[in-house]
């Protein structure tokens, strides 16, 4: 053939090109394209062979026909549905899905919507973790069992991956072509139902966002949805449904909302019982009923920011995985390989007439065989409630444990431990200790903070120190104290420092340093509002909700849980002018500074008393202990005489100012003088502190 394009010269060039490519030593590492189509080395060799017997035009036509046959084999509508999604109904037939417990109502509602003649598109709306995807899996199982209306008894639920639709669509029109193939696949199968998890992603998915006319997935699906040509099940959260789906009125009216609420604690326990067998088989760990109940109860109490049943299932899964890792299963392959090696060694020993060695090898073989037999189908560990407590502790950092004898004694002695650090304030210590014991023992109502207290009294008597010691004793970390100096919250913009700015104001997206964000990150904290009388009245209004309901809504609309915090407000109102407030009614004094509804929210209003000299004796010992801790880093020991202690108390005592002057005296007279002595005697290992001529002196050894 000789025309404008295919002629004898081109035929010769084509054959020469094929010959050069075939002779390359690196064919496997190259890519070959003919007419813009990539071909494999095998296809290239076949075309080369054809080119030897036919013209170049015939070879090109043969390649196009082969490509069309390949596209016909791979591009069928039925196959395309399998390529972009999972057939949940088939997985249900194969027994690959977990059982769905306690969701019969939602499954029934979804089945009823699917049975409609038009607009048969249910959308499951619920918060993250409540089990929306599980409901669709439950529907697939119901279809397999035949417990659905006749209109959908033959349906196949295909879970579609939206990213698979967008993959490889770098050219204009490619995405729309994929959608049309999807729609045609559903039409041709006549029984396919598409499931889009996180369906809000279809809004604008595939659109270019310009005026080029490129349409998104939702725009292409709308006509088919309204005519009932395809049926879709969607799942999304309340926020995403409001912010995305409801904004598109045309799309919204094509869906029927099915509300999915969080299951109760009782229902969650039944859910865990239903999936227990799957977890036991996977982890080879036994999971008794009391462990399942502990997963639900402890996750409700200590993981309030998440929802059931997801958080309870996670706790169960983490616990079982942890126990499985501690008791690893026998490696069957390695053990059998070792037995084979020992059999060879035994034969060699028998051949060499080393019967004692052969007998020892036989004993080792028997031990390994017994180990293999015992490991088959046996649970290697049994979970306990204490294991669940350890998991919660690893997740939250809170020392959660069962109420054993040691924990009971620790709760009983919490007041003694605090009293050893807070001198002269027994009433305040006892009131706080009672609130802690009530909460940790599980007798709290759980709808308010662990405790809320107003500490009132003169300066320097231990109000702030009690909050610090409480954070250390209760949560094991001084960083668990969130301290807010209310002098910084006295202006009218103080609310934004507490809950963050609202929409439309600067800093709306950056609320990292607010109280609500700190509590969200560390829900187990002691919150100290120091000198609360200096706060703006709007701050006190916010605290009313926190102390009454145990939660607070931040500037972005998120509800922050305060039910695992201890709220302490300190104030020296009424004590600042030398008034003898001890002889007055404390509530009468407080009403001069705070509204009655604010005072009425506290669990207790505790009056801190003036410190006398007897109390300072214990305080000076604590301050000197802190000095010794510093000296231990240098390997230096210290002895302080009683005369020196009395001298420090006499010099540092001030009834109106409390213990702070004593702290300054210890720093100036003890720490500074030890520092001066150390700089002159760097090899000192021991110092004695005494009084000579009404002066504190330091002598070393």
Curated annotation (Swiss-Prot):
Q: Which GO terms describe its molecular function?
A: ATP binding; ATP hydrolysis activity
**Region of interest (I), ranges:** 81-332
Keywords attached to this entry: ATP-binding, Chaperone, Nucleotide-binding, Virulence
Q: SMART domains in the record, alphabetically?
A: AAA (SM00382), ClpB_D2-small (SM01086)
Cellular component terms per the entry's GO annotation: cytoplasm
Domain named UVR: residues: 336-371
What ranges does the record list as Low complexity composition bias?
58-72
Q: Does the keyword Zinc apply?
A: no
Q: What is the annotated role of this protein in its UniProt record?
A: Required for the development of induced thermotolerance and intracellular multiplication within bovine mammary epithelial cells.
Q: What protein family does this chain belong to? A: Belongs to the ClpA/ClpB family. ClpL subfamily.
Name of this chain's protein = ATP-dependent Clp protease ATP-binding subunit ClpL
Which gene name belongs to this protein?
Answer: clpL
């Amino acid at each position: 053939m000789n025309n404008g394009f295919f002629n004898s010269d081109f035929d010769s060039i084509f054959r020469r090109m094929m010959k050069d490519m075939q002779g390359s030593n690196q064919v496997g590492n190259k890519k070959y394209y003919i007419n813009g189509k990539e071909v494999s080395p095998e296809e290239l060799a076949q075309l080369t062979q054809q080119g030897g017997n036919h013209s170049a035009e015939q070879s090109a036509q043969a390649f196009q026909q082969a490509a069309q046959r390949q596209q016909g084999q791979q591009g069928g509508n039925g196959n395309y549905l399998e390529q972009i999604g999972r057939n949940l109904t088939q997985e249900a037939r194969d027994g690959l899905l977990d059982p769905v417990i306690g969701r019969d109502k939602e499954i029934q509602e979804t089945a009823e919507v699917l049975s409609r003649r038009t607009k048969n598109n249910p959308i499951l709306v619920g918060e993250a973790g409540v089990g929306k995807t599980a409901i669709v899996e439950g529907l697939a199982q119901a279809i397999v069992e035949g417990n659905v209306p006749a209109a959908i008894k033959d349906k196949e639920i295909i879970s579609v991956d939206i990213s698979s639709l967008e993959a490889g669509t770098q050219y204009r029109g490619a995405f729309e072509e994929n959608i049309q193939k999807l729609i045609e696949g559903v039409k041709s199968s006549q029984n396919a139902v598409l499931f889009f998890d996180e369906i809000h992603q279809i809004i604008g998915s595939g659109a270019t966002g310009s005026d080029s006319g490129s349409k998104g997935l939702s725009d292409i699906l709308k006509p088919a949805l309204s005519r009932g040509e395809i049926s879709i099940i969607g799942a999304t959260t309340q926020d995403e449904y409001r912010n995305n789906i409801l904004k598109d009125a045309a799309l919204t009216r094509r869906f029927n909302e099915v509300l999915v609420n969080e299951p109760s604690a009782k229902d969650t326990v039944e859910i865990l019982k239903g999936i227990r067998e799957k977890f036991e088989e996977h982890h080879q760990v036994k999971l008794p009923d009391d462990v399942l109940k502990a997963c639900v109860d402890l996750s409700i109490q200590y993981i309030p920011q998440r929802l059931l049943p997801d958080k309870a299932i996670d706790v169960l899964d983490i616990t079982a995985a942890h126990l499985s890792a501690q008791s690893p299963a026998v490696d069957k392959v390695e053990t059998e390989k070792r037995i084979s090696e020992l059999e060879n060694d035994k034969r060699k020993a028998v051949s060499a007439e080393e019967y004692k060695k052969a007998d020892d090898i036989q004993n080792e073989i028997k031990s390994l065989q017994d180990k293999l037999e015992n490991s088959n189908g046996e649970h290697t560990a049994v979970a306990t409630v204490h294991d669940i407590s350890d998991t919660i502790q690893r997740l939250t950092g809170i020392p959660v444990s069962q109420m054993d004898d040691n924990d009971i004694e620790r709760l009983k002695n919490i007041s003694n431990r605090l009293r050893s650090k807070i001198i002269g304030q027994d009433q305040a210590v006892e009131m706080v200790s009672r609130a802690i014991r009530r909460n940790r023992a599980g007798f709290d109502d759980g709808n308010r903070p662990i405790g809320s207290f107003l500490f009132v009294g003169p300066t320097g008597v231990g109000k702030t120190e009690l909050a610090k010691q409480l954070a250390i004793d209760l949560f094991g970390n001084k960083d668990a104290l969130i301290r807010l100096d209310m002098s910084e919250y006295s202006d009218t913009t103080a609310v934004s420092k507490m809950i963050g700015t609202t929409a439309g104001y600067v800093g709306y997206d950056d609320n990292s340093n607010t109280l609500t964000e700190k509590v969200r990150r560390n829900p187990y904290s002691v919150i100290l509002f120091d000198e609360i009388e200096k706060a703006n009245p709007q701050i006190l209004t916010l605290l009313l909700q926190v102390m009454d309901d145990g939660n607070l809504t931040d500037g972005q609309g998120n509800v922050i849980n305060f039910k695992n915090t201890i709220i302490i407000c300190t104030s020296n109102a009424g004590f600042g002018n030398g008034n003898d407030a001890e002889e007055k009614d404390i509530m009468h004094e407080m009403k001069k500074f705070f509204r009655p509804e604010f005072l009425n929210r506290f669990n207790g209003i505790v009056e801190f008393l003036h410190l006398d000299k007897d109390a300072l004796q214990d305080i000076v010992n604590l301050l000197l202990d802190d000095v010794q801790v510093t000296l231990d880093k240098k390997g230096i020991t210290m002895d302080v005489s009683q005369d020196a202690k009395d001298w420090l108390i006499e010099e540092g005592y001030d009834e109106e100012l409390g213990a702070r002057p004593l702290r300054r005296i210890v720093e100036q007279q003890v720490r500074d003088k030890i520092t001066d002595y150390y700089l002159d005697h760097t090899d000192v290992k021991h110092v004695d502190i005494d009084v000579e001529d009404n002066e504190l002196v330091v002598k070393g050894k």
